[in-house]
């Protein structure tokens, strides 16, 4: 696939502050369970929609505050269709779900509640990556934030579902990938025979230099290696996009120092909303509900760049002499091509790694 790095950079810059996402709700067999990211909900929701960027952080398990149980637990059974509903700001029809520049895979893990809360026992039950020129995030946006799996035939008990997005618009540098995840509390009421395998630790299953974490979407590539373990062969889960995992080598990425903060700046506090309709599926009340912090709305500061922190880069090979055409690279760290743009254009610095010829 030939990727136009210039257009991707512009798209990323345009979406600078219109970017992040969290899971707002869950559907069971196409029945809306109501908002789950409220203080009395069933999702272990973070205080805002900022991503996790340090794959060794304990926040990788269920995001910030993820060790605290939610107030409710959804009752499900083997074979049920579970749909996770992602959003940027709200469930309104105008919501953009997640920035279209935030390309990457969508996955779902599952673990027994006690083990999963402690960061162990996580089993991947679904994954979508890159296939036929389309990313899983493209499909997620097209489906209005919805991504579905099927409940495996596991023994009865309480479990956590962990949907995850990895946004790779800054994945060309170490520490640049942005990970979004929450944990949804469920109680499996059917009593199946497919015991979950030992699973992996989260954090622990990813490293900052994994080919699917350190991945340059601005270079030409034909395939993408989804990080983490393989999908459990005892899972009945499929995925809504049908993308598959591949072991092809990732395109070359630029190595840079990791960001000083393990979390990218918050853009919007995760809103607490009220839901008048009662969920169609019964829920189990937890002993101590948690409070979703929304009193302070973080302020987003827009800075020029090809990604949220202004540090994304686009790699290209260009002649050292001559003039550079519109939207082509004209400068930046490790760039050795011409820095002279065609007449009527100027070489604009989007970030230290990428300068581009645009209209003056």
From Swiss-Prot:
Residues 1-19 form the signal peptide. Residues 322-358 form the CBM1 domain. Residues 254-293 are annotated as: Disordered. Keywords: Carbohydrate metabolism, Cellulose degradation, Copper, Disulfide bond, Glycoprotein, Metal-binding, Monooxygenase, Oxidoreductase, Polysaccharide degradation, Secreted, Signal. Glycans are attached at residue 334. Belongs to the polysaccharide monooxygenase AA9 family. This is AA9 family lytic polysaccharide monooxygenase A. It comes from Aspergillus terreus (strain NIH 2624 / FGSC A1156). The gene is eglD.
